[in-house]
Structures are given as structure tokens and as C-alpha cells.
Amino acid sequence: HPTGKVTIFVGAHSHGQGHETTFAQIVADSFGIGMDDVNVIHGDTENVPFGMGTYGSRSIAVCGSAIMKSVDKVKEKGARIAAHKLECNPEDLEFANGSWNVKGTEKSVGFGDVALTAYVPHDYPENEEPGLDFASFYDPANFVYPFGAHICVVEVDKETGEVKIVRYIAVDDAGNIINPMIVEGQVHGGVAHGIGQALYEGAVYDDSGQLLNASMMDYCIPRADNMPFFETDHTVTPCPHNPLGVKGIGEAGTIGSTPAVVNAVIDALSDYGVKDLQMPLLPQRVWAAMQQAK
């Protein structure tokens, strides 16, 4: 915008992952402007009619990279405008702290001034089209490969078969991390989902095929008081296949937690000779497995 504010139109829709914050942060950090100066618009097919959607932990790696491509285009054109205003060559400029600066001097022009000039081109480079609007598409050169290790410690009540998680540790590698709080939130949510699948959640049918727990009144999901304190950490191995060096994190918690919980329970029952349990590991199933092993 002529005011120096930025609007991002994206084809990936957020449904709880915090795209609005992360995408705005990419642009704000790149241009040296405030987060309040960046507006993210998603789900608007009038402005962005095509988008491959939000799935596969791909939003930051694919959509974030497309945003970064547009950021680079803005900087490249902005350098030509700034060079005209500063009477130098674009190659003599470097962008830092929200300004194009002439190397080795104190001469500079701010991002907002360049944006205003781009839309009010009274003093403007010859043959340069006004405006600072760019659209970018990004096709990943390869897949990203996040990885991690999840450790679960459980206690099993021998009298009732009830499983209690006493400690849960997760260490994941999602490449460069844009927003640590959002990444941690994604891991927490995923781990909770995985614990729910392992211990609580399941469709129950009667002999006639009628679903018995079809509402949230009857379907068992984990509550906050069923969850332990999650201990999380990260290693950082930048992905070489995208400009941000990022990997997806949205599925890490669920992928790691379900087998970690089930394996921990089976390990706790190793003295009974239990080697397999069907999810969810309801107390009656665990108790029955122990009785059968006896």
C-alpha cells in the first residue's frame, strides 16, 4: 500500500494453525515493519481462485515459500526505486532494518517512502511500472522430511487396568522455526490427539451396526486433566529445498504420540507376556489382557 502497509493474499486456509500470525511474521521480519502493518487474507476465492489447500503439514513450506518469493520481488523492484531516489545503482544498495541503504554511507530510504513513490510515481525510474503488487507460485523441488523422537512413561493399575501417563517428552526437528509458540502449540495439540486415539477414542457399534457414541455426549475424548505436562524441545536442521529452510510440524505430535503411548503400555505389561493390544487401550481391555496372560 502507499502507506507502507502490506496485504498478503494466500490460497492456503487456516483452521487453527495460526497462518495469520506466521505469514505476517515472515513479511514483517523481511521488510522491517510491524506485525500490525501486515494483513493476511485467506479463503477469498475472488482474489485467489486457486490453491492446493491446507494438508500434509505443507502450509509453511509451500505457501510460506510463495510468500517469500513475492517478498524478494518487492525488494528487487524496491531497490530500483530506491536507487533512483538516492541517485545510485541498485547494486550499491543493501536492505536492512526496513530501509534500502547505500553501502558504506549513511544515505538511505525507508520501505514506506519507496511504497509511496511506487504508487505516486512523480519522481520515478524511467520505464518502471508503478505499483508494488506481485503474485508468486511455488512448486517444491522436493519433499520436506521432519523427524523426531517421542518418549512416553506410563503406569498401569494392576487392579483396574487404568493407564496413567506420568511423563511425556517430545523432541522434533521442523527445520527453521518461524514462531516457536505456534510450533509448540501444534505439537501439544497433536500429542493430545494421539493420546486420545491410543487411550480413549473409538467408535462403538451394537450388534445391528448402530453407532452408539455418535455425539460428543457419548464419544470419549481426552480432557486437559487427562494430559500430563508435555516436555518439548527441538533440533534445527534447515530444509535445503525451500527458501525458508522450514519443514512441517502439524502432524508430528500425532504421528509420534500414538505408538509411543501404546508401546509404553505394552512394555509395562511385559511381565505378563502381553505383546499386542487393540486401541483404544481402555481399562477393561488392559485388565482383560492381564487376566488372560495369567
Region roles according to the model:
Residues E20-T21:
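Conserved strand-to-helix beginnings and helix N-cap segments that scaffold or border functional pockets
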Residues H1-V6, K158:
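Condensing-enzyme catalytic core mediating Claisen C-C bond formation in acyl metabolism
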Residues Q25-K294:
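C-terminal catalytic domains of large/alpha subunits in multi-subunit enzymes
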